[in-house]
Design a protein with these regions (language model features):
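Phosphate-binding/switch loop-helix module in NTP-utilizing enzymes
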Residues: 49, 54-65
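Conserved coupling segment at the C-terminus of the helicase ATP-binding
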Residues: 63-66, 71-216
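Conserved two-lobed SF2 helicase motor
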Residues: 35-52
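Conserved Walker A/P-loop ATP-binding site and its immediately adjacent core
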Residues: 1-24, 46-49, 208-211
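Short, glycine/charged-enriched secondary-structure capping and boundary segments
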Residues: 15-19, 54-57, 81-84, 214-216
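Hydrophobic positions in the central parallel beta-sheet of the AAA+
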Residues: 2, 40-42, 67
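Conserved catalytic network of the ASCE P-loop NTPase/AAA+ motor domain
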Residues: 32-34, 57-61, 191-194
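Short acidic low-complexity segments
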Residues: 26-36
Length: 216
């Protein structure tokens, strides 16, 4: 599998490969790919998401033999976004989470609460205290599960990736969104990626060794 940061680059790689006479496909069900006669070119979001065909299904996950991740720094940024749930302020999920935390946030930091929730100041942000997040863990999960459907894609694709560590996640509230993100990235959930026999990372520079550790 050849993985790139976005769908525009998928098209670019496919066009160049065909020009060079290399057999490639964008279809994971392609016969030639299934029989190791063609390289699957896809985006990192296709590999890493809450319903990935490469490890998040109960059965029938697509195995990965060798995987090349091109522009690993950009792909790492995309992976971090995949593991974050961003809930827009216009949604009912946002309103219910604000209502859940309202009383404690007023007591914890009344000025920030007024700026963000009442005055809608987009320049401000507020971290939900970890003790309040853990105390409300079950109620948070109920709200996220309530809106865990294809109409709420951020929750739909993100929750399966972080639900196991939801209790220790950070939650940042702004006037425009709520962002829920884990302390670390658990790529073991993408089992086929974890079990790939060979992983190759490509970048113009790999000065930051943590990138390799992050994707090991």
């Amino acid at each position: 599998i050849y993985v790139v940061p976005d769908n525009y680059l998928v098209k670019q790689v496919v066009d160049e490969a065909k020009r060079l006479g290399i057999s490639v496909t964008e279809d994971r069900d392609d016969y030639n790919y299934s029989n190791s006669k063609a390289i699957l070119v896809t985006s990192i979001q296709t590999v890493v998401n809450g319903y990935s065909y490469f490890g998040m299904r109960e059965s029938g996950n697509y195995p990965i033999g060798s995987i090349i991740i091109d522009d690993v720094h950009a792909c790492m940024d995309k992976i971090m976004c995949q593991f974050m749930i961003k809930i827009n302020a216009e949604t009912d999920a946002y309103k219910e989470l604000i209502a859940l935390f309202s009383s404690s946030l007023k007591d914890y930091n009344p000025k920030s609460y007024i700026d963000i929730v009442e005055m809608k100041d987009c320049r401000k942000n507020m971290l939900v205290p970890y003790w309040e997040w853990q105390r409300q863990h079950d109620n948070i999960y109920r709200i996220l599960k309530k809106y865990n459907n294809s109409d709420n894609k951020e929750i739909y694709f993100g929750l399966p990736l972080i639900e196991r560590g939801l209790e220790t996640c950070d939650c940042i509230i702004t006037a425009s969104a709520i962002e829920i993100s884990p302390k670390g990235i658990d790529l073991e959930k993408i089992s086929s990626l974890e079990e790939a026999s060979r992983r190759i990372y490509m970048s113009a520079t790999l000065a930051d060794d943590s990138v390799c550790l992050f994707l090991r």
